[in-house]
């Protein structure tokens, strides 16, 4: 890779990292589940695009397989499956009123700053693109956790979990130029199995208490005690 190509690769990767992080912010403020799933699919598309660009720039052919797996699983299959459950359980009309939405968004911004603070010690020994990409990847992971904490619907928790995996996967692409293919296939299979199990879990909970609101589950636990 010559210097000009490397500079283009750096700019594109950092731009995609910023957009992936932006999608995590947008997911934080979403009250409608269908919109949340759509934004997650867009984040998956950006991740697949980043993987394909890394494969082309680094001449790493097995990253093309990773890009295809990401496209199939996180842009098509998993969003389709979650959307199907949302429609089947008639949750698409529900609007989740977020408590302290402004505070949640400020907390998300603080997590991005914290991510850069955590990675500050390695700035002297790492490249500009690596530090920024890793910081934004860590921010995506933390924002996914915040999404799970701030939303009440179990489906939003699943989307947050998948978003965390997106952040970890992007960090692996940037820092290691891609994991070994067998590891990537294993991770993709684990994500697929987790998505299917979550779908079964949704149906069982919905049939039991006719809701996927986590607050209702907590109240049931308090009554049992």
What residue ranges belong to the model's regions?
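Alpha-helical transmembrane segments of multi-pass membrane proteins predominantly involved
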Residues: 1-225
């Amino acid at each position: 890779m010559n210097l000009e190509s490397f500079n283009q690769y750096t700019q594109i990767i950092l731009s995609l990292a910023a957009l992936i992080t932006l999608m995590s912010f947008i997911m934080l403020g979403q009250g409608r589940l269908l919109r949340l799933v759509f934004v997650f699919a867009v984040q998956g598309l950006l991740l697949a695009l980043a993987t394909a660009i890394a494969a082309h720039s680094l001449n790493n052919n097995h990253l093309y397989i990773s890009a295809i797996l990401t496209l199939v699983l996180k842009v098509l299959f998993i969003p389709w499956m979650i959307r199907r459950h949302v429609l089947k359980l008639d949750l698409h009309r529900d609007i989740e009123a977020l408590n302290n939405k402004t505070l949640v968004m400020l907390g998300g911004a603080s997590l991005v700053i914290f991510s850069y603070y955590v990675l500050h010690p390695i700035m002297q020994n790492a490249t500009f693109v690596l530090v920024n990409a890793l910081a934004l990847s860590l921010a995506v992971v933390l924002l996914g956790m915040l999404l799970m904490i701030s939303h009440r619907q179990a489906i939003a928790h699943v989307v947050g979990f998948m978003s965390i995996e997106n952040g970890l996967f992007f960090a692996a692409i940037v820092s290691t130029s891609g994991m070994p293919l067998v590891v990537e296939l294993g991770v993709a299979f684990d994500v697929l199995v987790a998505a299917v199990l979550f779908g079964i879990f949704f149906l069982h909970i919905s049939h039991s208490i006719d809701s996927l609101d986590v607050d209702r589950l907590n109240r049931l636990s308090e009554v049992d005690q």
